[in-house]
Structure formats: structure tokens, C-alpha cells
């Protein structure tokens, strides 16, 4: 399967093929999460405490694309950001598992 760089497709497209490396997609998800956290008025340390995490640096790892929001934390993470958990999970799946997202929901804009 040919991989193309993310810059080669329009920003809102999720075609049927892999369009970006997983690290690039995780970074895009992290950027979105960082904006949502800022909108909620939370620091990384605040969010980590609310989620029961031992280290706030995990939030940084997720926001910088080095890790993902664990499935078991998606509901709590969404709630702490004031977002509806199912919509939050659906949005993250678009970045973390783009092919699964396309199969389940079809292509949609980010």
C-alpha cells in the first residue's frame, strides 16, 4: 500500500488509503486535545490530577504525539474537558485509527 504524506491531501479529507504516518496523526490529535484543554482552562498538571494520573508528563506525551489517550481514559478525559464522551472518542479514532473510522463513519472533516 502506497503511503502519501499528509500534506498531499486536503486538510478535511480522509481517503480510503493511509494518508499520514501514525506519529503525524497522533500529533494532530494532540494539537486538538491541547486546544480543548486550554478551552477548559486546565493546565497539564490539573488534567493529570483530575484523571488520577501519577505524572502530568503523560498529558504532554499525548499532546505532542508520542502517546495516545488510552481507551479506558477517554470517557473521563472527555468529561474533564466538558465534551461528550462518544463524540470525543469518535474524533480521536479519526486520528488514531483512520481506516477504522472511515469504515464505521465514512469520510468526514476534522
Give the predicted meaning of each segment.
Residues 62-63, 73, 92:
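DNA major-groove recognition helix of helix-turn-helix
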Residues 52-68:
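Recognition helix of helix-turn-helix/homeodomain-like DNA-binding domains
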Residues 40, 51-52, 62, 81:
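Core residues of bacterial helix-turn-helix
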Residues 79, 87-110:
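Short, charged recognition helix plus adjacent turn
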Residues 45, 56-57, 86:
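Key DNA-contact positions within bacterial/archaeal DNA-binding proteins
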Residues 7-8, 70-88:
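DNA major-groove recognition helix of helix-turn-helix/homeodomain DNA-binding modules
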Residues 30-50, 76, 108:
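Short basic helix-loop element that most often maps to the first helix and adjoining turn
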Residues 2-39:
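A short, Lys/Arg-rich alpha-helix, primarily the initiator
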Amino acid at each position: 500500500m502506497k503511503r502519501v504524506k499528509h500534506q498531499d491531501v486536503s486538510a478535511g479529507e480522509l481517503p480510503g488509503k493511509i494518508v499520514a504516518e501514525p506519529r503525524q496523526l497522533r500529533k494532530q490529535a494532540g494539537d486538538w486535545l491541547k486546544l480543548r484543554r486550554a478551552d477548559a482552562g486546565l493546565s497539564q498538571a490539573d488534567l493529570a490530577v483530575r484523571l488520577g494520573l501519577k505524572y502530568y508528563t503523560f498529558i504532554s506525551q499525548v499532546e505532542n504525539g508520542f502517546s495516545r489517550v488510552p481507551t479506558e481514559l477517554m470517557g473521563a478525559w472527555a468529561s474533564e474537558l466538558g465534551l461528550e464522551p462518544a463524540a470525543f472518542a469518535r474524533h480521536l479514532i479519526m486520528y488514531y485509527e483512520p481506516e477504522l473510522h472511515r469504515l464505521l463513519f465514512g469520510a468526514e472533516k476534522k
